Amino acid sequence: MTCSILMIETHQNLNSQKNIIVEDLTVTYRNGHTALRSASFKIPEGSIAALVGVNGAGKSTLFKALMGFIPSSRGKISLLGYSVKDALKNNLIAYVPQSEEVDWDFPVLVKDVVLMGRYGKMGLMRRARPEDLAIVNKSLERVGMLDFEDRQIGELSGGQRKRVFLARALAQEGKVILLDEPFTGVDVKTETNY
C-alpha cells in the first residue's frame, strides 16, 4: 500500500534547510511487520500538505516516527534543520493523534487540556502567565470551543473533543503541526471552517 504527499500551499523553496525532510525512512515493528518502507519527501517551511492514503498505508506510523514515538529502522528525518529529538526539545512540533488515550472520567476542564499545550513554553514551575491564558482562549476561539472552556472534557462529543485537542496543538505554537485524521468525528461545518 502507498500513501502520497499532496502539497496544498507552498511558500518556500525546496532547497532550504528549513524543511521537513524525510529520506529513505523505513519503520519495522518488533514483530517484524514493516509499516513504512523507504519513504522520502520534502515539505517546505510554511507549507500546508496532506498525507493521503488508504487504511494501513503507514500514515500514522509516519507521524509517530516524526514525533519520535517509534524508532526508524533506516533513514533520516530532519525537521526544520533539527533532529526529531532537538525539534521536540525546542517545542517546534505540535501533534494531534488519530485518537487520544485519555481517561474520559478524569475531571479535567477543557481549558486545562488546552493549557497543557503551553507546558513546554511555561517553564519549570508550569505556572500559567496571562499571555499563556490568552493563547489558550485564542486557540479555543479558533476552533469554536471557547464557550466550552469550563466543561469537563468527558462531557463533550467526539468531534468536540477532537477540536479541543486541535486547540491544544494550536496553543503549542509549534512551527510544525501534525494532524492525524484531524476531521474524524468532526461535523461538516467545522471541517469546512478549518
Sequence positions of predicted segments:
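A short, flexible loop at the N-terminus of ABC-type nucleotide-binding domains that lies
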Residues: 6-38, 43-47, 125-126
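The feature captures the beta-strand-to-loop junction immediately N-terminal to the Walker
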Residues: 52-54
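Helix-to-loop junction immediately C-terminal to a conserved catalytic motif
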Residues: 67
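Conserved ABC transporter NBD signature motif
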Residues: 75-88, 93
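Conserved ABC ATPase "signature" region
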Residues: 115, 130-148
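Conserved ABC ATPase signature
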Residues: 128, 152-156, 160
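Catalytic Walker B motif of ABC-type/P-loop ATPase nucleotide-binding domains
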Residues: 177-181, 186
